[in-house]
Swiss-Prot record:
Listed cofactors: Mg(2+); Mn(2+)
Subcellular location: Cytoplasm
One GO CC term on file: cytoplasm
Record: residues binding Mg(2+): 223, 247, 251
Calcium in keyword set: no
Annotated residues for binding of substrate: 98, 108, 132, 223
A GO BP annotation: L-leucine biosynthetic process
Gene encoding the protein: leuB
Name of protein: 3-isopropylmalate dehydrogenase
Cross-referenced Gene3D superfamilies: Isopropylmalate Dehydrogenase
Amino acid sequence: MPRTISLAVVPGDGIGPEVVHEALRVLREAVPADVSLDTTQYPFGAGHFLETGQILTDSDLAALAQHDAILLGAVGGDPRDARLAGGIIERGLLLKLRFAFDHYINLRPTALLPGVASPLAAPGQVDFVVVREGTEGPYAGNGGVLRRGTEHEIATEVSVNTAHGVERTVRFAFELAEKRDRKRVTLVHKTNVLTFAGSLWQRTVDRVAAEHPDVTVDYLHVDATMIFLVTDPSRFDVIVSDNLFGDIITDLAAAISGGIGLAASGNVNPTGAFPSMFEPVHGSAPDIAGQQKADPTAAILSVALLLDHLGLSEAAARVSAAVSDDLAARATGDAAPRSTAEVGDAILRALSTNH
């Protein structure tokens, strides 16, 4: 049956427009013949804020909510610009979108693909997914400051963990594990110190685990997890964690599997009540913007996540396979640097020729 995907595109700042351009080329090639792609571009980002004084208005949110999904490039301007201090763009755009659209799952697949160098001497088979809770924890904004600027200043950041928020994240992790070959869930927290929140997470995992007898479950403190990510990353299949620990885990996971230039992510509302957002993990890199030096692979892998989320799993697999082919070819072919467009061309060729 014919279908139209309504996609909001936010190229953003710096290298964002360049990598999104290549991602859209691949997306248009990958969608099945009976699927049409209707894209609407939005100017949000640091540049838009500096021009207009606005980051993301209520009317902007209402417009974005009408789409099936959002593809984001990267946002952020010159870090030396005082007008952008304090993470104003990240909080006013990315976090605002996450909370407004209830993106309670931050999904970060990690795989060491053939031809990709890892800083680890013997990484083994690296193929796991981090399921990070996206709307609670210390990022919920529950805190404050008293006596700022004095020797008696008090600053608090309260980590908010609700039974509802924890359970829906844990259930997503178990349902994902059921679809994977190894069917293993690892809860990562710090239950020996963060006893109240840790207990809620552990009790929830124990209860949901009883409904999934085919899934193996274990627990690691977050510090032990960081060690195992370096010494034995192949032990992991699905990691589930809170907002803060998940944020830290995913950056190290990217580092051991080729770097953030290959890392894709999804901020997901699994219910479909709001559009989910997909983006490369890397930043806007304003120092190389417009020079065709950025690798668009992470943005293209974000397209694979987007397709899978929209139920087009075969198209998603084709994109992932084409990226794998290109990465393998890079390792054995000409080592000369390629432009952003040349990487896009190569992945498009692999997609149309082999997949």
